[in-house]
Regions:
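Signature aromatic-anchored transmembrane alpha helix within multi-pass, membrane-resident enzymes
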Residues: 1-8, 167, 210-214, 281-282, ...
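Transmembrane alpha-helical segments
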Residues: 13-18, 179-180, 328-331, 341-368, ...
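Transmembrane-helix motifs of polytopic, lipid-linked glycan transferases
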Residues: 91-115, 152
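Specific aromatic-rich, kink-prone transmembrane helix
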Residues: 104-109, 125-126, 145-164, 168, ...
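Short acidic/glycine- and proline-prone juxtamembrane loop motifs at membrane-interface regions
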Residues: 132-145, 310
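Short periplasmic/luminal acceptor-recognition loop of GT-C membrane glycosyltransferases, typified by
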Residues: 165, 367, 379-416, 423, ...
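Hydrophobic, aromatic-rich transmembrane alpha-helices
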Residues: 191-192, 260-298
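Membrane-lumen/periplasm interface segments of specific transmembrane helices
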Residues: 193, 204-245, 258-269
Length: 509
């Protein structure tokens, strides 16, 4: 049965396998893909010093940004396949799909360790067919890799296999450091499985298990000394003063609940969690594991998700909640399954499938109404040019779509202030374009769930030729960016959602 779930996941993941990255959180997808492209073109130098083709404020003179956060696994693993077969976008997607399949397998195996095989299949289905997994398990982002690594490390800790568990956890934290909190329950599971009875044995196993992840992380971070100065490193990320979302306001909780509920657990998952808490079936697991899982998830939410409230960061806690939900459904296995219960479960399953389809469609809908126009504008720009983009995010997506170095400007005041220096730094073009405004996790709040459900009947919105209601409005003739650029610069290309200008210095007033 679990193979059938994996096959169904592959069928859904095959949707637009070779297309551009335009779906939910495409900015982050294109950032990872850009790093991978540099690996495919430059080889080991782009692995040791990962980079992307957009520039950041304060570093405008440099036509790229060094990103020493996650290790570029998509680039490293995909490199030989791209050299042999080409098809870069297909290859990087297939790598994510492979690790999503690993994660489904690990959820199944973990549950089978504690429950019956049928419960393992339920958990694998809840996880593998969750809208968040169907989306982020197909795109070139590191989140499915780190989640699969976390689950793999936990499974091999239960066996117990110290070297392989340690290796999977090293992979997980190199893919994304944020999952380091889950080392606590993984190590706890290993120590319990090894039946450590003395403090000396406890310390020895802990040191042996943690040595590879610690040394690997230190080696990766130490390579920063050979990099050009960049704000995007593991060390600077950890040390950055960012208070994150307020715990006193409702916005953070609305995002978290919206992401975990219908985008994550679904109807059956939420019901299972309630059943697990009511029937206390989760107590079948060792109390020490439960306590450390609770602590690590609380720390992860407070330290990671509160600071970066984006949907892909939901995947690790979602995996543990799916396991909790499966314990809940397993609690019904010993009781009579009468007609009324069968009807109720059937209705819940039907509603779960409907909701999963709706919210998966929302995540996989294009956020760019005019990718063809953007690419056509890119064809008018000579190779190795530098382009200013009027854009609400940091510029990773335009760098891929235009195949140029880009610098994002977020307001007319910012553009006017920075323009003289940007021209000196070699920026010769300005591109204005409209994209969906909710490319971050904000659209997953509870206030948007009903709107998303209604989009089932408007699936064409956001595709070429179809206006979307939530587009940023930069290209309208009365929009501030257009009013600033029209008459100052030579217009090279203009459509409803894309306008390209040449920065001829003689035209600038």
């Amino acid at each position: 049965m679990v193979r059938g779930i994996q096959l169904l996941f592959i069928i859904v993941a095959a949707f637009q396998l070779s297309g551009p990255f335009l779906t939910a959180h495409n900015e982050r997808q294109n950032q990872t893909y850009d790093m991978d492209r540099h690996v495919f073109e430059d080889g080991w130098s782009a692995i040791l010093t990962p980079k992307a083709s957009f520039s950041l404020p304060g570093y405008e003179a440099r036509p790229y940004t060094v990103i020493r956060q996650e290790f570029p696994f998509h680039g490293l693993l995909g490199w030989p396949f791209v050299k042999l077969f080409g098809h870069e976008r297909v290859v990087v997607r297939l790598i994510s799909i492979a690790f999503a399949l690993f994660s489904i397998e690990f959820v199944y195996l973990i549950l089978q360790r504690w429950l019956n095989p049928g419960s393992g299949v339920i958990g694998a289905a809840l996880w593998g067919l969750s809208p968040l997994v169907l989306q982020f398990g197909q795109v070139p982002m590191p989140d499915i890799l780190c989640t699969a690594g976390m689950l793999g490390a936990f499974w091999f800790a239960l066996k117990p296999n110290l070297p392989i568990s340690s290796a999977w956890f090293l992979f997980a934290i190199l893919a994304k450091l944020s999952v380091i909190f889950f080392g606590l329950p993984i190590l706890t599971a290993l120590l319990l499985a090894r039946n450590c009875r003395t403090s000396g044995e406890f310390i020895r196993i802990a040191v042996l298990w943690g040595m590879a992840p610690l040394i690997g992380l230190l080696c990766w971070s130490s390579l920063e000394i050979r990099d050009p100065d960049t704000p995007w490193t593991v060390v600077k990320l950890v040390s950055t003063q960012n208070d994150g979302a307020s715990l006193l306001g409702l916005k953070f909780y609305a995002f978290f609940a919206g992401s975990l509920s219908l985008y994550g657990l679904g109807i059956l998952g939420m019901t299972g969690c309630v059943l697990a808490l009511i029937n206390k079936t989760v107590l079948k697991a060792r109390p020490a594991i439960l306590i450390t899982l609770l602590i690590s998830n609380i720390l992860y939410v407070l330290v990671v998700i509160r600071r970066i409230p984006e949907p892909q960061y939901i995947l690790p806690p979602l995996a543990w909640l799916v396991i909790l939900a499966t314990f809940g459904w397993n609690s019904l296995s010993g009781s009579p399954f009468n007609y009324g219960r069968r009807v109720a479960v059937t209705l819940l399953a039907g509603l779960h499938i409907l909701v999963a389809v709706i919210f998966t469609m929302d995540l996989k809908a294009s956020h760019v109404p005019s990718i063809n126009d953007i690419e056509n504008a890119g064809h008018l720009i000579p190779a190795n040019s530098r382009v200013i983009v009027a854009y609400p995010f940091y510029g990773a997506s335009p760098a891929i779509w235009l195949k140029q170095n880009t610098m994002a400007e977020h307001s007319v005041g910012e553009l006017e202030s920075n323009l003289p220096q940007l021209q000196k730094d070699g920026f010769d073009y300005i591109l204005i374009m409209d994209v969906k405004s909710h490319s971050t996790g904000a659209h997953m709040s509870l206030s948007q769930l009903a709107k998303t459900a209604s989009s089932l009947f408007h699936t064409g919105a956001g595709t070429d030729g179809q206006p979307a209601a939530d587009l940023i409005d930069y290209t309208a003739t009365n929009a501030p960016f257009r009013q600033f650029c029209d008459g100052r610069f030579k217009q090279l290309y203009a459509t409803r959602y894309v306008v390209l200008y040449s920065l001829d210095p003689t035209l600038y007033k």
